[in-house]
Structure formats: structure tokens, C-alpha cells
Amino acid sequence: MKKIAVLTSGGDAPGMNAAVRAVVRYGVRQGLEVIGVRRGYSGLIDGDFVKLEYKDVAGITEKGGTILRTSRCEEFKTEEGRELAAKQIKKHGIEGLVVIGGEGSLTGAHLLYEEHKIPVVGIPATIDNDIGLTDMCIGVDTCLNTVMDAVQKLKDTASSHERAFIVEVMGRHSGYIALMAGLVTGAEAIIVPEIPVDYSQLADRILEERRRGKINSIIIVAEGAASAYTVARHLEYRIGYETRITILGHVQRGGSPTAFDRRLALSMGVEAVDALLDGEVDVMIALQGNKLVRVPIMEALSTKKTIDKKLYEIAYMLS
């Protein structure tokens, strides 16, 4: 193997740049030519390639986002689109591809291998932390720290005004961010997709806390469980006083990655290159315990990952 490529796809996650840097620098050290694909799978279809040298990735570890840019590509979801991408790969003599992204990106990588035998290795990078067989994905730790900081600031103002604040965080199918953020900030309630919410019970609990002298409440909601506005409407009807809504949105994706995310991304980038050189393809690099392992991409994607119900109960008891 003499030439490999790397791309970032889907939603960005803090630490993607660190992974790109590791793939490039370690690849060059192994005597490989490394090509960067701009704009994810859209760039793969269009042939938007750039050769990356050692110096091109200097100083990017600490930067959020991705220097390669990213996109969500509808064309790549079609067989015709993937065929165009495969032709570009072969035309440019690329012998292996590292894909950094979430569920959709990794599915695309698997299809490239299944349909066109393109050697691929995936690196999980998504703040939702919803990919199976890996304890953590790149970007999750940074996102949690961002949410924790924001909620702590909201608690300051909530206590000043004796209000209930409803904070909506990302998590379409997974309540991981909501659960962990709620646990570490002492939120009064956590609403996640995995557990049905009873608004009457929630309102009763907040009112009981009021009777005990607690003058403010923080409710953290995963976007996939309910909208913050829906929660606010139900609560205001039942508790009789106003709430305030904060939707953190895309601020959760940004920021300089934490030390944990940097280390994870750098290690996964190196392992991905090694996997290609070893001929172990159609695999994803996963963190299990304190070790990096290689697992089949589709096995990871077909393994349902859910929140820790016991941890949810602990968060409830400690709030």
C-alpha cells in the first residue's frame, strides 16, 4: 500500500482534526502518500482531493471543527453516487480510505467496501455517543464539558430568579449527553428518548421540591425525547409558574477538544492506519475499556447502544 485518503463526514465533532493529523503524520512516517478529501462524501464524488504533507496538519490538534470540512451527501446514499466515488478513488490510485464520522458516515464506508471492495477503516466521531461496541466516540467528552459549563451558568441565574430552566441538548436517538450532563450538574430531571416521560409525575416532583424550599429547577431534555417547548408547555400548565428555555444547539459541536478527546483521536488515527497496512479492512476502531480494538463496522452499527438505566436511577436519586 502506497497511497491512502482520509475524510470527515456528517456532523462535526471536536477532535476530528486531531484524528486527521494522526492519520497524516503517522501515514507519512510509514512511507505513505496521504490524500485529504474535502467536504466528506461530496468531495469524494467530485474528486475534491488534496495531498497532505507533514506540515499541512501542524497546529490543528487543538482546533474544533475539521480542516477538511464536512457535509451530508444525499447523492452518496444512492448506488450511482457510490459508484462515482469508487471511480474517483481508483482513478487517483488510492488504496485505502479512513472515514471519520458517525453512524451514517460509517455505513457509507461499509457500503464502499461491500459494493466496490474499497479498503476502508472507520473512526467513530459523534457527540451523540450512539455507536455500538465502543465505550466512547471522539467529541463526546468535549461536548459534555461544554454542556456542563452552560448548565452551571444557567443554574446561577435560575437561583437568582427562582425559575425552572429547561435545557435542550443534542441526542436524536440517544440520551447519553442529557443523562451525563444531568448527572454531573445535579439537574432535577432528565428526559431521554429511552425512557418515557410522565409529565404529571415530573410536575409533582418539582412542586414537592418547592415545598421543601428549593427555589429553582434545571430540567435537561434530549432533543429526540421531546422539544423543550413541549416540556415547558406541560410543566407550566401543571406547576403554575413560568419556565425559561435554553436550546444549546450547535455550540455543543464546537470548541477546542479536551485532553481526553485529543488523546482518543490521535490514538484512533494511528490505529486506523495500522489496520489498513495490516489488511484488516471494513472495520471500525473502538475503545473498549482502556484498549483500542478493531471491530466489523456493521457489527458495531447493528449493536444497539442505550443509556445505563442504573446510572439514570442514580442521577434521579442524587438530584
UniProtKB/Swiss-Prot annotation:
One of its GO terms (biological process) is canonical glycolysis. One of its GO terms (molecular function) is identical protein binding. It comes from the Bacteria. It catalyses: beta-D-fructose 6-phosphate + ATP = beta-D-fructose 1,6-bisphosphate + ADP + H(+). It is found in: Cytoplasm. Allosterically activated by ADP and other diphosphonucleosides, and allosterically inhibited by phosphoenolpyruvate. SUPFAM superfamilies: Phosphofructokinase. Pathway: Carbohydrate degradation; glycolysis; D-glyceraldehyde 3-phosphate and glycerone phosphate from D-glucose: step 3/4. The active site is at D128 (proton acceptor). InterPro entries: ATP_PFK, ATP_PFK_prok-type, PFKA_ATP_prok, Phosphofructokinase_CS, Phosphofructokinase_dom, PKF_sf. The keyword Cell inner membrane does not apply. Keywords: Allosteric enzyme, ATP-binding, Cytoplasm, Glycolysis, Kinase, Magnesium, Metal-binding, Nucleotide-binding, Transferase. GO terms for cellular component: 6-phosphofructokinase complex. Mg(2+) binds at E103. ATP binds at G11, R72, C73, G102, E103, G104, S105. Its main location: cytoplasm. ADP binds at R21, A22, V23, V24, R25, K155, G186, A187, E188, R212, K214, I215, N216. Pfam families: PFK. Substrate binds at T126, I127, D128, R163, M170, G171, R172, E223, R244, H250, V251, Q252, R253. Its EC number is 2.7.1.11. Catalyzes the phosphorylation of D-fructose 6-phosphate to fructose 1,6-bisphosphate by ATP, the first committing step of glycolysis. Belongs to the phosphofructokinase type A (PFKA) family. ATP-dependent PFK group I subfamily. Prokaryotic clade 'B1' sub-subfamily. NCBIfam families: PFKA_ATP, PRK03202.1. This is ATP-dependent 6-phosphofructokinase. It comes from Thermotoga sp. (strain RQ2). The gene is pfkA.
